[in-house]
């Protein structure tokens, strides 16, 4: 471990887990909370709320660490990522790996306070999180794999509340898989030129000139599946208002990404968590007023 002042070391750890960019974990928190509310048929209680908020943030942070370790040689050639702690040499791989392990263990301890079914589902969640960065070497749509990894929180939420994973959970999982495909393709559009040079595979490269149309299609599938699976739950106008606000944001995203500028695509990605927030607000308010 290099001789770096403790305050500076903490700053590097926070940079490693993207603590200064909450959009990255908010895109995961909102769908997970919406699933938790549906699974519990309303407010799930403070214990589960705390477990899933903290667990989601911890696992996303661990995922960032794993991603940076796996991509450290590629990140040197990407304009946006050259100064990340591992890539720039400010943190060693072993030290970063230790950070990731600690974060994962803390998240696992939190899950242990729930049902064993939730604990069981947390194992593949960790495995997919570890494997995701390596799919960018050979899989044409690694964002789809990311969607699988990101949305285990939905499955685990139902397992923690109900001790099972019903069809509703899987439809919500699929809906949010499309949401991840949408916003992470926006993110991939930011780095497309650099990724082409270094041979990285992304959905933005695979989709080519159909990228914007595909993103809009992914958003529509997300909202459509969410509306379809939640309509029977009697959540009334709050659900439809939330979905309407989310749809309005999708329209705004189109204006941001249609010209494919780095700035517009990054803005779209960084604001994408508001779509999940609108849906969660509709679900939570619907249960409150039901």
UniProtKB/Swiss-Prot annotation:
Q: Please give the InterPro entries that the UniProt record associates with this protein.
A: HB_polyprenyltransferase-like, Prenyltransferase, UbiA_prenyltransferase, UbiA_prenylTrfase_CS, UbiA_sf
Q: What EC number(s) has UniProt assigned to this enzyme?
A: 2.5.1.39
Give the pathway listed in the UniProt entry for this protein. Answer: Cofactor biosynthesis; ubiquinone biosynthesis
Q: One matching Pfam family, short form?
A: UbiA
Q: Which UniProt keywords apply?
A: Cell inner membrane, Cell membrane, Magnesium, Membrane, Transferase, Transmembrane, Transmembrane helix, Ubiquinone biosynthesis
Provide the membrane topology annotation: Multi-pass membrane protein
Catalysed reaction(s) here are: all-trans-octaprenyl diphosphate + 4-hydroxybenzoate = 4-hydroxy-3-(all-trans-octaprenyl)benzoate + diphosphate
Q: Which PROSITE patterns does the record match to this protein?
A: UBIA (PS00943)
Q: Which GO terms describe its molecular function?
A: 4-hydroxybenzoate polyprenyltransferase activity
Principal place of residence: membrane
- Keyword flag Hydrolase: no
Q: Which cofactor does it need?
A: Mg(2+)
Q: Where are the transmembrane segments?
A: 33-53, 91-111, 116-136, 138-158, 165-185, 212-232, 237-257, 269-289
Location in the cell reads:
Cell inner membrane
Q: Does the keyword Membrane apply?
A: yes
* A single GO BP: ubiquinone biosynthetic process
Origin: domain of life: Bacteria
Taken from the UniProt entry, a GO cellular component term is: plasma membrane
What function does the entry list? Catalyzes the prenylation of para-hydroxybenzoate (PHB) with an all-trans polyprenyl group. Mediates the second step in the final reaction sequence of ubiquinone-8 (UQ-8) biosynthesis, which is the condensation of the polyisoprenoid side chain with PHB, generating the first membrane-bound Q intermediate 3-octaprenyl-4-hydroxybenzoate.
NCBIfam families attached here? ubiA_proteo
Q: Which family does it belong to?
A: Belongs to the UbiA prenyltransferase family.
Name of protein: 4-hydroxybenzoate octaprenyltransferase
**UniProt organism field:** Acidovorax ebreus (strain TPSY)
- Gene this chain is encoded by: ubiA
């Amino acid at each position: 471990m290099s001789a770096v002042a403790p305050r500076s070391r903490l700053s590097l750890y926070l940079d490693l887990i993207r603590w200064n960019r909450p959009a990255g974990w908010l895109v995961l928190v909102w769908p997970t909370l919406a699933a938790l509310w549906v699974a519990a048929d309303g407010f799930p209680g403070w214990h589960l709320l705390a477990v899933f908020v903290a667990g989601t943030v911890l696992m996303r942070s661990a995922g960032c660490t794993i991603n940076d370790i796996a991509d450290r040689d590629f990140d040197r050639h990407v304009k946006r990522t050259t100064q990340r702690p591992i890539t720039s040499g400010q943190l060693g791989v072993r030290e970063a790996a230790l950070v990731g392990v600690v974060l994962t263990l803390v998240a696992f301890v939190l899950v242990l306070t729930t049902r064993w079914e939730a604990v069981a589902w947390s194992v593949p969640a960790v495995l997919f999180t570890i494997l995701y960065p390596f799919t960018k070497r050979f899989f044409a749509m690694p964002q789809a794999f990311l969607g699988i990894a990101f949305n285990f929180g939905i499955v685990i939420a139902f397992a923690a509340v109900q001790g099972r994973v019903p069809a509703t959970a899987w439809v919500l999982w699929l809906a949010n898989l499309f949401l991840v495909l949408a916003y992470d393709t926006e993110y991939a559009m930011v780095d497309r030129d650099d990724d082409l040079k270094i041979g990285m595979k992304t959905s933005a490269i695979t989709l080519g000139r159909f990228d914007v149309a595909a993103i809009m299609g992914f958003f529509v599938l997300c909202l459509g599946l969410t509306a379809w699976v939640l309509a029977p739950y009697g959540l009334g106008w709050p659900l439809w208002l939330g979905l309407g606000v989310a749809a309005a944001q999708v329209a705004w995203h189109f204006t941001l990404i249609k010209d494919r500028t780095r700035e517009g695509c990054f803005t779209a990605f960084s604001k994408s968590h508001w779509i999940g927030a609108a849906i969660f607000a509709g679900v939570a308010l619907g249960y409150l007023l039901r």
